[in-house]
């Protein structure tokens, strides 16, 4: 399944591109559709604490039932300051300049959403040089078809 392959690829990228250990880390996951729920399961298996944001209340309820903590949009910036990893699967602008303000350089950010994605790339590169090294496009339109 494509969502499972995306989740495994995302976790592999996170492990490879972060100076901290994924196991037991605080992870933010935005978007709880097929890919988001698959990533949640992988992170849960690694013993991570997962905080989910999704604008859909039903998606939040599913995430909560699966063991995730739920975050409101207004609290994303505060939670991000404590997180080690951010996995975005939301295809609309969630991570704006305002929300990303003051983000620690150590946070490993992975953009998995279809273009245009949910992360304001200019804000990241302006605020934290280190993000250019870890910001990855794990899932692209035909990437998994060629690999799997």
Indicate residue ranges for each PLM-predicted region.
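Adenosine-phosphate binding glycine-rich loop
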Residues: 1-24, 118-148
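Glycine-rich adenosine-cofactor-binding loop
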Residues: 23-44
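Active-site flanking residues adjacent to catalytic metal/cofactor-binding acidic residues
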Residues: 30, 53, 110
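Conserved Rossmann-like nucleotide-cofactor binding loop
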Residues: 35, 58, 115
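Residues within well-ordered alpha-helices
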Residues: 39, 59, 120-123
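NAD(P)-binding Rossmann-fold cofactor-contacting core
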Residues: 46-66
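Rossmann-like adenosine-cofactor binding region
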Residues: 65-139
